[in-house]
Swiss-Prot record:
Protein name: Large ribosomal subunit protein eL14
Coiled coil: none
Signal peptide: none
UniProt superkingdom: Archaea
GO terms of molecular function: RNA binding; structural constituent of ribosome
Entry GO terms, CC: cytosolic large ribosomal subunit
Keyword Ribonucleoprotein belongs to the record: yes
Length: 103
């Protein structure tokens, strides 16, 4: 499967303190990094640069422009009817092992 990471794509963070939370890609820095935002008041993910290996794209996409502000992203999420979807947390899996199995 080809990873499709483009502006407006909803992604799930799979590593780090925000693992399992959803965010939206707002800018592509280079072939390894993108800028994402939750926005923070919606999902708890603040705007930051992340490695593409630390996120997993979903099939959802919203219509935003490159570098959109958190307010613009929030309005686009509301317009697409994805507010509850964005608030849901996903149990992160890394290499097929859940954190409960690591003990």
């Amino acid at each position: 499967m080809v990873k499709v990471i483009d502006i407006g794509r909803v992604v799930v963070k799979v590593l780090g303190r925000e693992a399992g939370r959803k965010a939206v890609v707002v800018d592509i820095v280079d072939e390894n990094y993108v800028v994402i935002t939750g926005p923070k008041q919606l999902t708890g993910v603040r705007r930051r640069r992340v490695n593409i290996n630390h996120i997993e794209p979903t099939d959802k996409k919203i219509d935003i422009k490159r570098g959109a502000s958190d307010e613009e992203v929030l309005k686009a999420v509301e317009a697409a009817g994805l507010v509850e979807y964005m608030r849901e947390k996903v149990k992160p899996k890394f290499f097929g092992i859940t954190s409960a199995e690591v003990k």
